[in-house]
């Protein structure tokens, strides 16, 4: 009887414990502990221009379902229900979009850097027309060296640059991603195949051509090989990607249009003359030269020949298009020849020595170098030589124009001259092939096997 009474009392106590007013608060006792484990937080996101370090106002910032606009200081504030890393989507007019995962758990105030599209250098020649001229970067001599990095062996073609990183390969196919801020190597990928061309940036991918006749596509963030395609002949032509199609020529004389999404050829144009020239694009027309001394104009969609014209020798370098004119270098002809983009002959400048240099076209002028050691400035419409500058050695690579300064590279020297007057503004004690690339923050000067990142010197 006594034991039964104790059981009944215990049962009544248990029932009261689950329903009684004083004890009801103990049921959700664990819930506040969960909140303490992931508390809410007011966080600040600052959107900055990655090249200039200036705030980006009126940028759209998406955090979860919420959408904000940055103020004049580039800030947005947002209350997170749970303080943890979440995707932040940033877009702004003229800038490359970005998705980041800032460490909100560690910091309440974070910075997301975005980059103006016009200040990147995503292909050899700077533009689809291969003008070798960057009109938006405003960096001029005198310079100070910010950092330098050895690359192990010959670098014949320049780095491409996007979103704070430079991508460059050496002669033996070792590709590096270098942080523009300090030159730190972000990753390295050794393809173990010789290279004689620049890379091209296509979204989050890198397109690479090698002398073993293979096209490689790498993941830009870590250098992982995504896929490759064999074409059967060495590729010295630097890639150019338009609407997802990579256009290039090969040593066996063929021209390819490779669809990078479908991983198959859109078309292939046969030929029997060696091609080292890269493709220049204007509108829907492709332009390139070959070792038979011809310049070809092809339809980009079909590969159909639009017209063919001859110059006075082999075409090693890459043509440049400026408006309605096409400028074609000839190595063995020692000349630069101008045509209209419809194929009409306009003029020719003879130098008396090899012209391997690809021309730069800017401001109504054309700039190129010769094995005679001179850099030339020529009127684009008249063909009249406006000035020449002695560089002290043979010029093999392209002339490049940035912010009104024309640069040419020779053995152990880069010379920069005012594009209007020809006055020499820079004599840098390193150089070899193509001298310059860069972004809106700094320029990269290219030597034989090392690059130097330079900033403008502050004038006192």
Describe the residue ranges of each PLM region.
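Beta-strand-rich domain onsets/edges
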Residues: 17-42, 48-50, 108-115
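Short, acidic Ser/Thr/Gly-rich low-complexity loop/linker segments typical of extracellular
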Residues: 55, 62-77
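Short Pro-Gly-centered beta-turn/loop motif in secreted/extracellular proteins
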Residues: 75-87
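A short beta-strand motif characteristic of beta-propeller blades
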Residues: 145-149, 184-189, 224-229, 264-269, ...
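A short, solvent-exposed loop/turn motif at the edges and junctions
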Residues: 85, 89-105
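Short loop/turn segments that connect beta-strands within beta-propeller blades
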Residues: 179-183, 219-223, 259-263, 299-303, ...
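Repeat-blade elements of multi-bladed beta-propeller folds
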Residues: 45, 61, 65, 120-128, ...
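Blade/loop signatures of beta-propeller domains
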Residues: 117-145
